[in-house]
Amino acid sequence: MNINPLIYFSSSSSNSHRFVQKLEIPAFRIPINQSDSPLNITSPYILLTPSYGGGSTKGAVPPQVIRFLNIAENRAFIRGVIAAGNTNFGEAYGIAGRIISEKCRIPLLYRFELLGTEEDVQRVRQGIQRFWQHDSLENM
């Protein structure tokens, strides 16, 4: 089965990076530093992002993700979002995913806490496979 790459952001703490590595699927990381070359996407993808801001909507989406999505071509190819968050923030748990979902009019596919569990890894891996299988069947 052909799976489109996962696009993700992970800060220098690398929590999201470690989660993505466990998925064992093709993935590209959005650069941390503004001085790095931007990531330009030319095919459909799912975005995985952490949520920032300590429970506030202000600053919830990492600025690197905002810059990435402000590139029209990158925004055009987004098909879904997965969010990492902290359940201590209650209603704001994984809020970056909800914000991106609403602004880009795409589904929020999954939320997981902090580093995620093995169950989260399995659910995300299987969910991504089903998502792309369904997408490819619709485009036949």
Swiss-Prot record:
Stored Pfam families: Flavodoxin_NdrI (PF07972)
UniProt GO MF annotations: FMN binding
GO terms (BP aspect): protein modification process
Domain of life where this protein originates: Bacteria
Family to which this protein belongs: Belongs to the NrdI family.
Function comment: Probably involved in ribonucleotide reductase function.
PANTHER family for this protein: PROTEIN NRDI
HAMAP family: NrdI
Protein name: Protein NrdI
Organism, scientific name: Photorhabdus laumondii subsp. laumondii (strain DSM 15139 / CIP 105565 / TT01)
High-level lineage: Bacteria, Pseudomonadati, Pseudomonadota, Gammaproteobacteria, Enterobacterales
Name of the gene: nrdI
